[in-house]
Regions:
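Non-catalytic architectural context of zinc metalloproteases
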Residues: 19-69, 98-100, 167-180, 196-198, ...
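Active-site-flanking segments in enzyme catalytic domains
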Residues: 94-230
């Protein structure tokens, strides 16, 4: 009898947790992965596929446990670079882990939401750029929270006068994330899409390979200005 009661209690607690998570984030099918991180982040995972957004245009698939267990330490290691106070200041509390993340059928590494204090991450993202992607997506939250601090018009003036950004990131074919050998103000092709993506790319390199950036800015005046701005 005690065994049966214990099973019922565990089931009820799981239901309560699932309901609380949904009420907070409005994302279905989430379960707790870890809530005891060093900086207070709560890690959740997709137990089943989900679609969210007004038009259900954001979708992500559930991950197998072995996939989660492999990628979680990488995610935690990178996000542990931020102290709890900084995360609170930038409205990040919940990390949602899933795979094959898309927005309107376009693949993406992450979906930040400062209103829900959440960041959805695709653990199936290209391993070469996975760690950078984490910081890239978090930067979008930082910029959204402190929009006045990041003047995109001023940022654009750092570039050569002949250069023009695209109208939007999704209407640009500048998508390559590999590092340029000759930067000339831009670390990757994706940096050339729009100012906010350029900022996020620069920030992501600063958080993952600061020594490389120090070398690059010695011979790149434009990139030097951008790094100092951030």
């Amino acid at each position: 009898m005690q065994y049966i009661i214990s099973i019922i209690l565990i089931f009820n607690i799981s239901v309560v947790n699932a309901n609380e998570i949904f009420n907070l984030l409005k994302i279905p099918n989430l379960e707790i992965y870890n809530t005891n991180s060093l900086n207070g982040l709560k890690y959740l995972y997709a137990e089943n596929n989900f679609k969210i957004g007004l038009k259900k245009n954001i979708s992500c698939d559930k991950s197998k446990k072995n996939e989660l267990d492999k990628k979680y330490p990488i995610v935690e290691k990178n996000l542990n670079k931020y102290k709890a106070a900084f995360l609170i200041k930038n409205n990040l509390k919940f990390i949602i882990l899933c795979k094959n993340l898309t927005i309107s059928s376009i693949k993406t590494g992450g979906v930040p939401n400062i209103l829900k204090r959440s960041l959805i991450l695709d653990i199936n993202f290209d391993p070469k750029y996975f760690e950078r992607m984490i910081h890239h997506e978090f930067f979008h939250m930082i910029q959204a929270k402190h929009n006045r601090m990041f003047d995109e018009a001023l940022w654009s003036k750092f570039n050569r006068t002949s250069f023009k950004y695209a109208e939007c990131s999704t209407c640009s074919d500048r998508t390559d994330l590999s590092l340029y050998k000759n930067t000339d103000g831009f670390l990757t092709e994706y940096s050339k899409s729009i100012p906010s993506e350029d900022m996020a790319e620069t920030f992501s390199f600063l958080m993952t390979n600061k020594e490389l950036i120090k070398k690059k800015i010695k011979n790149d005046l434009i990139l030097n200005k951008k790094v100092k701005y951030l």
